[in-house]
Amino acid sequence: GVATSADNYSQYWNPAKYAFASNNKGIGLSYTPYLSKLVDDIFLGNILFFKKIDDRSSWATGLRYFSLGEIQFNEFIAGSIVDQGIQRPSELTLDLSYALKLSSEFSMSVAGRFIYSDLKVAVDADTSSASSLGIDISAFYQSEIFKLKSNSALVRSGINISNIGPRLNYESGAQKSFIPTNMRVGAGLDIFFDDDNVLGFYTEFSKLLVPTPTAVFDSEQNLLGYKQPD
């Protein structure tokens, strides 16, 4: 989460947390299959690495790859279904972040992201893959440990505005697509019972910061689809 304790995967939630990491470095690997009961080739893969530069700062990098698997395209021509081939659409991001403690309890981070989206249909000459750049700006607060009745406790909070950047252009002359600019805000409390047992209470809110598509109707008020605002 955006406000939970730092871990190897903080790059995708709140890179500012790395400044409070207890380890000097770490690596994360994950593989998440999608719709595994229906298909076996849709998945999300991640690899991450972070390293603390000193007690106040750290850097991290990450690679994320999403595969939509093999998709068979067909076209209905003159009453017959014509095979248009198999496509393997995918998306990839490459991140780099830097986090710095501005005080003993507060840190901020900035991250840069290269985005590559290959969702084109090969038989359509007007479409192509698209790329863009995104920036994340995040902050993290972690209080000093204090007494809460008979136990120790601390408070954490965080905010991350991610994917600030230009839109993707899949087709020349067509409307561009927004990248998913998003804001996460969260806070929580950790209660320590002993060295091995911690109880945490956290809440988080997320808001997509791009325009909502508007419905398009014909003259008889039949829904034709949705249009993305400029």
Where are the language model's segments positioned?
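Subset of outer-membrane beta-barrel
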Residues: 1-230
